[in-house]
Regions:
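Extracytoplasmic
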Residues: 50, 54, 76-80, 84-175, ...
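Active-site lining segments that contact anionic ligands and/or coordinate catalytic metals
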Residues: 381-383, 410, 487, 494-499, ...
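Short secondary-structure junctions
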Residues: 90-97, 411-414, 601, 634
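Acidic-histidine catalytic/liganding microenvironments
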Residues: 11, 85-91, 135, 336, ...
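Juxtamembrane segments of multi-pass membrane proteins
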Residues: 39-68, 73-77, 337-463
Length: 717
């Protein structure tokens, strides 16, 4: 290792050039990285919702919906607005029915706009922008609107958040570092690692908006301590060698094992996300683990050369080091052990019992004030699609629709059989299309039918009027109506599957919504003979909710076992490794309890990510203290060892943890996107809890179990 360290230090100029080229290439890669906003892409391969969405796209093409509402339109303007919206490019259809409370209520006019492009396409965004630019008084909601808010917030929020986070981290480093120059060197080195990680994301098919948003800041927070560990070792070696090159060579050679060991726990914890069924875990796990690895490579290959090159500047800018005496605190902790330990055990036990009571969110990522106002005016309009085989008996479909319409929580049911497939009498048809009733009756008699569907009548009327003089205007009206009917029919009847749209009077997620969706699915399973699929936000949320506890428990078990094995192998102590894992896992439970008691709804990925990051990253704080304690116990009694060990550890623990908390708290407070904000806030909270547990509880447990805690296999006494 020393030979390799010599090459890294002495050939530093070549390494600088290599990194400069790599950063330029990765800067290009950053702008070519594809960001995915469609969370349905991360559904498991065997997901019923995923399969249903694929079938719906194949059968009916891509489409998306925008709800548009206006206040105070008169009757003439209401119909004009429908025509104006229909005239917008890429608008497939607009549904608005005058005098129907679903669309017109208390002076509010609601239009359901269908766009002939998927939710995340440029064409859908163009339609939304056109509506907003043309009508300042329009209220808009829907998936297209949510996606627009999301992309706009990332563009607007991230630069501000990054700037403030960097300022916060510089302040922390200026306070805790021994030189005014060190923070700039540390941040520069990690900045290169972040650029490499973000640039190499271009080689991935895409990364999620969540990964893109938090990746850089989490990489910064999770790997800054590697720089500090190498710098501390360099300061020790400089006391032994006159040459700063020799000092760095030895510092690097001696730092590889502890720094690598520290990073391995973090990487293993993050890679546990890869084993989630919901593929957002793979996305975040791979990118974040890659980021920590990139940081590790930069610390080992770039930082040594930079430190040697700027050694004089570092020495000239030396300042008084902040000392945090912990000997007295540790004495107090051991004296109050009979109170602290039982209290902590009670809190952890209570947290474990209530860990499943946390309110988990899966879908809502924004508070859209327009959507809230529309729902206040018209109640919830939560649309769910049922795809069923087109050879299902009409009676089965009719009975299912009848069952749906009897429910109090159903706004409407739209199927071909109860819309375009409905047969009308001559009088009804005449009123619908502006014919004389006698004309309509004559057409019915000539066709030999007592009733007709809209499509049948349009076809019959068009063929009969072809040879009638002065009927061009009427034929043009019939042709336009026929095109509209054909277009709407194509959106309901597919080659293999038909589409039924059910509007529920529930929010998109929550116990009531998921329960209602479950009842709809169960009833369809009983009635329909062929394969069928439900598609919609609530269906996706229910599917995620059904598997969440299993997913969280699996990831928890995997991280605990994996980290326990890694700690044992690097630490060579079974009992103390078990204590470390137990303390950090207790921190996770306490963090969850704080969320439960606060009453907040937290995004599901936040809970899983907190488990992986706390277990993978903050356990390093415990490893550092325990290693120092075992070393001190070789020359002193346990009372003295506990104080000295914490004195040696606390500065590194605080520096690393405050940076992670600073990054996450800044993002949590300033990010308008809910899922990202909740995730980062929870990581910040969890890290703070972990620090308290490591600084006050872990030393007490190690102290009380001294003989077992200091036992290491494979080493002589």
């Amino acid at each position: 290792m020393k030979k390799l360290s010599e090459i890294i230090v002495r050939k530093r100029k070549i390494i600088f050039v290599v990194y400069a080229i790599a950063v330029v290439l990765c800067a290009v890669g950053i702008f070519n990285c594809k960001i995915n906003y469609d969370m349905s892409k991360y559904l498991p391969d065997d997901s019923s919702v995923r399969k249903g969405m694929e079938i719906m796209s194949e059968e009916f093409g891509d489409s998306s919906a925008i709800t548009v509402m206006f206040d105070g339109l008169d009757e003439n303007k209401q119909l004009e607005m429908k025509a104006d919206l229909e005239a917008i490019e890429n608008v497939q259809s607009v549904v608005y029915i005058p005098n129907d409370e679903t669309y017109q209520k208390d002076g509010h006019s609601k239009y359901m706009v269908t766009v002939s492009a998927d939710t995340y396409s440029k064409n859908s965004r163009k339609v939304l922008d056109k509506i907003k630019d043309t009508y300042d008084d329009a209220y808009v909601s829907g998936a297209v609107v949510d996606n627009a808010l999301m992309t706009d917030s990332l563009v607007g929020d991230l630069p501000v958040i990054a700037l403030i986070a960097v300022i916060v981290i510089f302040m922390i480093l200026f306070i805790l570092c021994d030189s005014w120059a060190e923070p700039f060197i540390f941040m520069g080195c990690i900045g290169v690692a972040i650029a490499l990680n973000m640039g190499t994301n271009a080689f991935l098919p895409s990364i999620s908006f969540m990964t893109f948003s938090v990746g850089a800041l989490l990489q910064l927070g999770l790997s800054m301590d590697y720089s500090i560990m190498l710098m501390n070792r360099y300061a020790q070696e400089k006391k032994k060698y006159d040459s700063h090159e020799e000092a760095m060579i030895n510092a690097l050679a001696h730092s590889v094992a502890p720094v690598s060991g520290s990073s391995v726990t973090t990487i293993v914890g993050l890679l546990a996300l890869v084993f989630m069924d919901f593929k957002i875990g793979q996305d975040m796990g791979v990118v974040l683990a890659k980021g920590v690895f990139m940081s590790l490579v930069c610390i080992f290959t770039l930082l040594p050369g930079v430190v040697v090159a700027f050694d004089k500047m570092i020495e000239k800018s030396r300042k008084k080091s902040l000392e945090i005496p912990m000997t007295g605190v540790m004495k107090l902790v051991t004296k109050l052990g009979a109170v602290i330990l039982p209290a902590v055990l009670i809190i952890v036990g209570f947290a474990y019992i209530n860990k499943d009571d946390v309110k988990v969110g899966f879908l809502k990522v924004f508070d859209n004030s327009d959507q809230t106002y529309i729902e206040e005016c018209f109640d919830y309009d939560n649309q769910t699609v049922l795809l069923y085989k087109n050879n299902e008996s009409p009676e089965t479909v009719a009975n299912y629709i009848e069952w749906l319409e009897k429910r109090d929580d159903i706004n409407s049911v739209q199927d071909y059989s109860n819309t375009l497939g409905v047969s009308f009498t001559p009088a009804e048809i005449a009123a619908q299309f502006g014919f004389e009733e006698s004309q309509a009756q004559m057409m019915f008699q000539m066709s030999g039918k007592e009733t007709m569907t809209t499509a049948e009548f349009l076809s019959t009327a068009s063929s009969m009027l072809k040879n009638v003089p002065d009927s061009e205007e009427k034929l043009a009206q019939l042709k336009a109506a026929q095109e509209l009917v054909d277009e709407n029919t194509s959106q309901m009847l597919g080659n293999e599957y038909n589409r039924m749209v059910v509007s529920l009077r529930h929010e998109s997620e929550g116990n009531k919504s998921f329960s209602a969706i479950g009842e709809l699915i169960d009833e369809a399973d009983e009635r329909f003979e062929g394969t069928h699929y439900f598609v919609g936000d609530s269906v996706m949320g229910k599917e995620m909710n059904d598997g969440f506890k299993k997913e969280l428990n699996f990831v928890t078990m995997l991280t605990v076992i994996a980290i326990f094995i890694v700690v044992i192998l690097t630490f060579k102590a079974i009992f103390s490794s078990a204590i470390l894992v137990a303390v950090i896992q207790s921190s996770v439970f306490i963090t969850t309890l704080i969320i439960v008691l606060s009453g907040f709804t937290v995004n599901y990925i936040a809970l899983i990510l907190v488990q992986c990051i706390l277990m993978g990253a903050t356990i390093d704080y415990g490893i550092l203290f325990t290693c120092n304690y075992i070393e001190e116990r070789r020359t002193s009694d346990k009372k003295q060892a506990i104080g000295t060990a914490m004195n040696r550890s606390v500065k590194t623990i605080l520096t690393s943890s405050l940076i992670l908390i600073g990054c996450c708290l800044t993002t949590g407070l300033l990010m308008t996107q809910k899922a990202i904000s909740q995730t980062c806030s929870m990581i910040a909270c969890g890290t703070a809890v972990a620090v308290v547990m490591v600084v006050f509880v872990l030393p007490l447990v190690i102290y009380l179990t001294d003989k077992l805690a200091t036992m290491q296999f494979g080493r002589k006494k």
